[in-house]
Design a protein with these regions (language model features):
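Aromatic-rich carbohydrate-binding modules that target alpha-glucans
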Residues: 60-116, 126-184, 188-199
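C-terminal catalytic histidine-bearing segment of alpha/beta-hydrolase fold enzymes
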Residues: 383, 392-455
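Primarily recognizes the serine-hydrolase "nucleophile elbow" in alpha/beta-hydrolase
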Residues: 261, 321-376
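Short beta-strand segments enriched for Tyr within beta-sheet-rich domains
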Residues: 117-125, 245, 300, 304, ...
Length: 455
């Protein structure tokens, strides 16, 4: 499959424009500058002294429970495009152009958002219209430009996107929270980056220097003859080979391991007793084209339940129970999660699907082929979530959930206020795992999804 032959996600405009608003603070400065342009330098300095953190958050004086979220950028430019995950409409970029305070180099744009919203964002300044990177070339070039924008220098909270670019993150007060506080940040050295691209079973390292009380082990496996790809297997400290343990199968593993150091974040949850100790297997996607080929219409579940699972059973003491085998994926990977549970419920019995690419018909075709009256998916469990800002995917999730439940699957159906966004997915993984593999202390964290029974 090539870029010219693979399926293309629908590119439809937002059904409603993003909720632009007016910040009282910025509007007051703007009006003063119009009346007193000679005070531009003074008023700009006063504004930046007043703004202690960005984006600027103000309670909406007109709508209770809403916030006015003002993004600020300072720098010489003829135009600045603000890219906010799933608020920026690629079919209507003009609505995301920032406004300039007259006579200054300060740019701003305000949205009215509910208090549980989270999103990654970045800035794309252009010194001239001809240099605007978002106006040069195809949809692919546009996507590349948006992904490679600049983070907010005044916001220390960041998230790395799939392509490896650092973006800033805005989280409003009621957004789901990581149970142990802020999302944990580890250095590459602490995460074992020096061994990420090593080879051979046992080419691992401890993570005692990662701020954890106990050390785990990361094995870098390059058994290409058997597995056909590189994988990484993390064994947390509480695990011993004297008994079997659950296993997490993480699709797009190179992103979660190298960009987000997910093994150490989940190890902290295990240490705290929030989720059960489990092996974490990071599965390399093989790159863009291979990912589209395998996680699209191909049957990647056959690989997960065949060569991979058989190899893991030989080398690690993984649980024989399908309920203890959890496959995790996002976007195309999330579609693969659901298809694997449908096709192989006797081998993998639990899954976390985040923003599944349900615009492809393949899952619905497979569900329609089931005899739902026999409840063939009884005993399987899934956490299925989508962002309310995902205007193409969100309307499709209820249909999938209905059909899966009809076939016997226990589904936790969740909608979060956000987009197609690692900044949201990484936080929500904690609640999903507390649901599917709860530890003795599995309680909802501040603002997190409740850890209750599946329905």
């Amino acid at each position: 499959m090539t870029a010219s032959t693979r399926p293309t996600p629908p590119k439809l405009p937002r059904p409603q424009p993003a909720p632009l608003a007016t910040s009282p603070t910025l509007d007051a400065v703007h009006q003063r500058l119009l009346k007193h342009p000679q005070l531009a330098s003074q008023l700009q300095a006063q504004l930046w002294q007043q703004v202690t953190a960005t984006p600027l958050l103000e309670a909406d004086p007109t709508q209770e429970g809403k916030y006015l979220v003002t993004f600020l950028w300072r720098g010489a430019a003829q135009r600045v495009l603000l890219f906010v995950n799933r608020l920026t409409d690629e079919k209507n970029l003009a609505d995301s152009y920032m406004r300039r305070l007259p006579g200054t180099d300060t740019w701003y744009l305000t949205y009215r958002m509910d208090a549980d919203w989270r999103a990654s964002y970045c800035f794309l300044p252009a010194l001239s219209a001809a240099q605007a990177p978002w106006l040069q070339g195809s949809q692919v070039r546009l996507r590349q430009a948006l992904d490679a924008g600049l983070p907010d220098p005044c916001n220390p909270v960041t998230c790395t996107n799939r392509r490896g670019f650092v973006q800033s993150v805005v989280s409003l007060p009621l957004a789901p929270a990581w149970p142990l506080g802020d999302w944990p940040v580890f250095s590459d050295a602490a995460a074992g980056a020096g061994s990420f691209d090593g080879g051979g079973l046992g080419a691992g390292r401890g993570d005692a220097d990662a701020g954890r009380l106990n050390a785990g082990r990361l094995d870098v496996v390059a058994d290409l003859d058997t597995l056909g790809r590189q994988i990484w297997v993390y064994t947390p400290a509480p695990i011993s080979r004297t008994q079997s343990y659950p296993v997490l199968l993480v699709l797009d593993g190179e992103v979660w391991l190298k960009r987000h150091h997910l093994h150490l974040a989940l190890a902290q949850l295990m240490d705290a007793g929030l989720i059960a100790p489990a092996y974490i297997v990071f599965i390399d996607s093989g790159g863009t084209e291979q990912r589209w080929q395998e996680l699209g219409e191909s049957n990647f579940g056959r690989y997960l339940t065949g060569p991979l699972l058989n190899w893991l059973k030989t080398h690690y003491a993984i649980s024989p129970k399908p309920a203890d085998r959890v496959v995790i994926g996002q976007s195309l990977g999330a579609l693969t999660v659901l298809r694997t549970l449908v096709a192989y419920p006797q081998l993998i019995g639990a899954g976390i699907s985040q923003s599944a690419s349900l615009w492809q018909d393949v899952l619905f075709n497979e569900l329609n082929a089931l005899d739902a009256t026999q409840t063939p998916l009884a005993g399987t469990r899934a956490w299925i979530e989508v962002g309310s800002q995902e205007w193409i995917l969100a309307p499709l999730q209820p249909k999938a959930v209905h059909q899966l439940r009809k076939a016997g699957m226990q589904v936790k159906d969740m909608v979060y206020n956000g987009g197609h966004d690692y900044a949201c997915w990484r936080i929500n993984l904690a609640s999903a795992l507390m649901q599917l593999l709860p530890g003795p202390n599995a309680l909802p964290g501040p603002g997190a999804y409740p850890a209750g029974n599946l329905s």
